[in-house]
């Protein structure tokens, strides 16, 4: 059973007739039970329709009882020996009453199926929030060949979803005002949170049970776009120009934060002047622009001894021309990057020496920040082998002692 309340009935009617999907209806009803969103959308839609339909039947029965009548009593009140009246009643039941019932059901149950594309989430909580998409995400993660114990699932949504959600909210708000009910917009469940509630378990299952947590060194980011409705935000540049400032480093001034800020500033009247409520139905769903995997940096530390008098600590390039063939940094980095399968690195050391100065004694401490490593753990044996690779390859130049990261 869905955790719905009496005050949710008009919201459900309003949103279903406006083209919202079942999960978005739950969001606007402020349902925070995660299990409710994990149900198949068709089952949820069926329960929503049943909830509203049963409520209306209950109201009808209460009205009849208040008038001191029952369906059987109303039927018995009709004179038995009056065929014309009976015929009229049968005709009314067979035609007019049936039509009224169909119209009433149509208002609450606009479609047997969910809308092809939800007017609020643009399909993010429909086909893109299910087993098929979970398989797609998992396949991308497996293809990248990362090693990880846990993962964090993040979502990037198009900014126009904020505009559409606000439009649906105003649509519901009007209904609530007429019925003297109060609902706070801050209590609405966000699309991003709903997506995570549904997909975290599904993705984890596809990856063999790897825990999907709220904090992890390994992140899987899913980015959605919807070019068809990009223009939904454009009116805000006029309605609240101060919120949108040109930035060369950004592809668009209509960032999610800027749109949210603008919606908070403008009045309902200004919004409704430029944008319809409820929003217009789209013809296409959101598409997955990118599924990106990223592991936070890890650090490898150690000490090095340098015996060569012609080896700089870092690459020596002057006016675009390389002066030395190699450097301490490069000699250490090459095998380390290969072992950890990292995309890049940052090298730092405790001080530095001139090219013609040797580093003796216990060696100079150094650290390497490995960017987006696909491997994060090496055994002590593997670390020893890595040390030997550097030593054997460059025995005339450098000795390296690498500490295993704790």
Go through each PLM region and give its residues.
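RNA pseudouridine synthases
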Residues: 1-406
């Amino acid at each position: 059973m869905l955790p719905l309340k009496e005050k949710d009935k008009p919201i459900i009617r309003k949103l279903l007739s406006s083209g919202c999907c079942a999960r978005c209806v739950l969001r606007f009803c402020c349902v925070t039970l995660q299990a409710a969103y994990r149900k198949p959308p068709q089952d949820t839609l069926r329960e929503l329709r049943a909830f509203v339909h049963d409520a209306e039947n209950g109201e009808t029965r209460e009205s009849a009882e208040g008038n001191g009548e029952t369906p059987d009593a109303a039927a018995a009140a009709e004179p038995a020996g009056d065929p014309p009246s009976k015929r009229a009643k049968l005709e009314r039941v067979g035609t007019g009453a049936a039509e009224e019932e169909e119209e009433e059901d149509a208002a609450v149950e606009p479609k047997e199926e969910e809308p092809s594309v939800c007017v609020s989430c643009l399909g993010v909580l429909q086909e893109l929030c299910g087993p098929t998409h979970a398989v797609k995400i998992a396949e991308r993660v497996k293809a990248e060949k990362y090693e990880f114990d846990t993962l964090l699932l993040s979502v990037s949504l198009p900014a126009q979803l904020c505009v559409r959600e606000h439009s649906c909210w105003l649509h519901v708000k009007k209904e609530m005002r007429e019925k003297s009910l109060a609902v706070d917009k801050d209590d609405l469940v966000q699309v991003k949170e709903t997506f995570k509630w549904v997909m975290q378990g599904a993705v984890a299952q596809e990856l063999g049970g790897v825990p999907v947590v709220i904090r992890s060194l390994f992140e899987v980011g899913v980015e959605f776009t919807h070019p068809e409705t990009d223009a939904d935000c454009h009116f805000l540049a006029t309605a609240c120009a101060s919120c949108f400032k040109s930035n060369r480093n950004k592809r668009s001034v209509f960032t999610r934060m800027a749109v949210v800020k603008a919606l908070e500033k403008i009045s309902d009247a200004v919004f409704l002047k430029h944008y319809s409520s409820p929003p217009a139905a789209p013809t296409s769903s959101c598409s997955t622009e990118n599924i990106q995997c990223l592991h936070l940096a890890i650090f490898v530390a150690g000490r090095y001894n340098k015996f060569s008098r012609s080896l700089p600590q870092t690459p020596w390039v002057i006016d675009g021309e390389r002066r030395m063939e190699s450097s301490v940094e490069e000699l250490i980095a090459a095998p380390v990057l290969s072992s950890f399968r990292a995309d890049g690195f940052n090298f730092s050391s405790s001080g530095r020496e001139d090219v013609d100065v040797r580093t003796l004694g216990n060696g100079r401490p150094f650290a390497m920040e490995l960017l987006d490593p696909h491997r994060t753990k090496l055994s002590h044996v593997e670390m020893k082998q890595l040390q030997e690779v550097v030593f054997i390859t460059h025995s005339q130049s450098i000795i390296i002692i690498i500490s295993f990261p704790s």
